[in-house]
UniProtKB/Swiss-Prot annotation:
GO molecular function ontology, one term from the record: ATP hydrolysis activity
Keyword Transmembrane helix among record annotations: yes
Domain ABC transmembrane type-1: 154-436
Keywords: ATP-binding, Cell membrane, Cytolysis, Hemolysis, Hydrolase, Membrane, Nucleotide-binding, Transmembrane, Transmembrane helix, Transport
Cellular compartments annotated: Cell membrane
GO biological process terms, semicolon-separated: killing of cells of another organism; protein secretion by the type I secretion system; proteolysis
Record-annotated Peptidase C39 domain positions: 2-125
Keyword Acyltransferase: no
InterPro entries: AAA+_ATPase (IPR003593), ABC1_TM_dom (IPR011527), ABC1_TM_sf (IPR036640), ABC_transporter-like_ATP-bd (IPR003439), ABC_transporter-like_CS (IPR017871), ATPase_T1SS_HlyB (IPR010132), P-loop_NTPase (IPR027417), Peptidase_C39 (IPR005074)
Known function: Involved in the export of hemolysin A.
Main location: membrane
Protein name as it appears in the record: Alpha-hemolysin translocation ATP-binding protein HlyB
Top-level taxonomy: Bacteria, Pseudomonadati, Pseudomonadota, Gammaproteobacteria, Enterobacterales
Gene behind this protein: hlyB
TM region(s), chain numbering: 158-178, 191-211, 269-289, 295-315, 387-407
Originating organism: Proteus vulgaris
Amino acid sequence: MDFHHKNNYGLYALEILAQYHNISINPEEIKHKFDINGVGLDLTSWLLAAKSLELKVKAVKKTIERLNFIYLPALVWREDGHHFILTKVNKESNRYLIYDLEQRNPRVLEQAEFEDLYQGNIILITSRSSVIGKLAKFDFTWFIPAVIKYRKIFIETLIVSVFLQLFALITPLFFQVVMDKVLVHRGFSTLNIITIALAVVAIFEITLSGLRTYIFTHSTSRIDVELGAKLFRHLLALPISYFESRRVGDTVARVRELDQIRNFLTGQALTSILDLLFSFIFFAVMWYYSPKLTLVILFSLPCYATWSIFISPILRRRLDDKFARNADNQSFLVESVTAINTIKAMAVSPQMTNIWDKQLAGYVAAGFKVTVLATIGQQGIQLIQKAVMIINLWLGAHLVISGDLSIGQLIAFNMLAGQIVAPVIRLAQLWQDFQQVGISVTRLGDVLNYPTESYQGKLTLPEINGDISFRNIRFRYKPDAPIILNNINLNIKQGEIIGIVGRSGSGKSTLTKLIQRFYIPENGQVLIDGHDLALADPNWLRRQVGVVLQDNVLLNRSIIDNIALADPGMPVEKVIHAAKLAGAHDFISELREGYNTIVGEQGAGLSGGQRQRIAIARALVNNPKILIFDEATSALDYESEHVIMRNMHKICQGRTVIIIAHRLSTVKNADRIIVMEKGQIIEQGKHKELLSDPESLYHYLHQLQSD
């Protein structure tokens, strides 16, 4: 079981797996350190090399059935050296997604195919950050540290609960005395004393109950604030791939699950649990009164639990269905509001309404099923309660008639039994809330358990110069997706103006996303000033890279706030200078509120050209050393474009500029033009050089635009 093979896929596998965990790797350095004999990495050398990269690795034997429970991706190795990476197991369809190291492509294998390839040997791989992330996984255990943090408050709540239970114990005893002593002996003085005592107990009980609710709600509200803050910070720290692979409405629906958790934390469920914990005291007193009646109460508790357990899985499935339909509705609503101009322009409101009606009907039906099942569950609990009450009444009356129990004792017993049964019934009736909050925690965990962009230990430098290098880049968005960039080698010098052109889908925008470190390449390195971006702090990098897209989003704030978004305390003069460079100052000055004009949601109060010029000013205001125009002028009218192109010399001065454009006139003055086709660079040179070759793609595209 070694990696000796004439093609030696071990080193390549290590490169792929390291980059998956956002760890930079220099294959030549690894080969020099660990491939001492020059014949490839054996298993021991491979494990040592992986550990040197701060990866946690372990070679184990696993049956195919156990592969459902391991952390993926993992490296499957074979005796013949044809190792492959296992990236996903679909246990429902019995399919396996692997990365073929020989073909350098993902493959989907059926069960039989996988069984033929798999020999039971696998290397489990995780990064230290992954392990920390798993330990900090968001589920119900997340609240344990919060409880420990506020343990003083919870101890105070516990002490108050003890006193409340004691008061609850005293009241039935007073009633027993009244029934058995006061009424029989006509003891008015005793009655007055007991009445005063009951009034004092009632006042203290109400006060302590209110105090407990206040303390408990105060502490749970602080936990709620912490969770809400953590959620928003985590959401903004997620990689761009998370948002691109999910619908906006689905993400919003998951975030809104925080409301369910909040309601559960601040509701009566947890205080009911505290009340239930003290039930053993009541059981002791009740047993003293009547073991037979106590046994009836004891036997009823498993009935409550059994009924709740029976209902739970059905209720959970229906709640899952309700959530999924709600997420669909959220997504459709967000999509419809966002695309309202298109919907109205195409007069498709009736069709959209029909879709909404069907989805809404499905959601209401799912909600109705949940309500019906919850009602059945609650009525079942009520039925058990009534049955216990009838049995106790019948049996208690027999005991009173036979002289084994006094009337006062029977009344006191029933009051004590109510102190036990009431929280049990409340918990049983709140079981739906518990199921809902369980689903909410799971759904919210999809956001909070998703790994964020790594910042710890990343490279930060005071200021970049602007040299950019792509070395042997191969990239795809998902393991099972087609290759977007393949064998990209490109060097861009500091201060150079580069134009990138090509057909749609050729990989132009993807190239700039790698510069911004939105993604890590599957193979190769992206370097800025000689530093590997896989090791760079994303925030440090993005603060020094200005980006203008074709469709830029402005926030519902003033123009000055939008331009100075990265630094709200920026001097006004700096904002105005950037606006002048972008050709936006003149039209801003003509607005009634000038730079204090609120632009509306997504800049709806401005024209497309005005929004674009503000976006350009926003990109320029921090004086970035690298500036990216991704179809930035394609949506502009010719006058607006002329203003920007007239200032282009000043805009580009002292910066490395990358201009992506379909309109070739935008890039004709670039220092160098890169032509891309199907994820590869096929041509590069100046405008005239590329036009001189009649067989070139650039010449063909230029001819099309000239016509």
